[in-house]
Amino acid sequence: KMMYPIGNALKSILDKILTDPRWDLKFIGMQLIIEGLALAAFQSTRELAKDPVLYDMLGLIIRDEARHVTFGVNYLEEFVSTLSEEEKNDRAQFAYEACLLSRERLLSTDVFEYFGWDVEEARQFQLGSDLIQHFQKLLFQRVMPNLARIGLLTLSLIHN
C-alpha cells in the first residue's frame, strides 16, 4: 500500500504560516497563498474534467474558495495600509518566500525519491511540462494581483 503524506514543501509552508505569532501572516499565508493554491488546483482540474457533474461541482468549489480569498484581500488591504514600510517589507518577504515554497510544492520530489529517480532530472522534466507551467500561471495570476492590491508587492521585493 502506497501513501503520499503531505509533501515537504507544503508542510514547510504550513509550518511557516502556523508557527508565526502574527495573525496577519496567518491571513496572508492561508487566505492568499494556500487558498490561491487551492483555486489553481481546482481550476486546472476543472479544465481537464470531462464529467459534467465533476465540472459543475468544481465550479461551485472554485466560487467558494474565491470568496475565502476575497475576504482575506478585503480585510488585509486596510490593515496593511496602517503598517510601517519595514513591517510591509517583512510581510512582503514572507509572502514571497511562501510563493517560492508553493512553486516547489508542485514538484513531487518525495515521489521521485520513493521510486529511486534522479530528483533533479525529474524535477526539471516536471517543471518543463505544459500542465505544471499552466498550473503555475494560474497560481500566480491569482496570488500576485492580490499581493499587489493589499500593498505587498513592494519595490524591494520586485528587485529581489
Residue ranges and their predicted role:
Residues 1:
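Carboxylate/His-rich catalytic cores and anion/metal-binding grooves
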Residues 7-11, 69, 85-88:
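Alpha-helix initiation and N-capping motif
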Residues 7-32, 48-49, 97-112:
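Acidic/His metal-coordination segments adjacent to aromatic residues that form catalytic metal sites
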Residues 23-27, 52-66, 91-93:
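Alpha-helical scaffold segments that form or flank carboxylate-/histidine-based iron centers
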Residues 28-42, 61-72, 76:
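Alpha-helical transition-metal enzyme core signature, strongest for iron centers
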Residues 42-60, 74-89, 118-123:
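Inter-helical turn/loop segments and adjacent helix faces that build the functional surface
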Residues 85-158:
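Extended, helix-rich structural scaffolds rather than catalytic motifs
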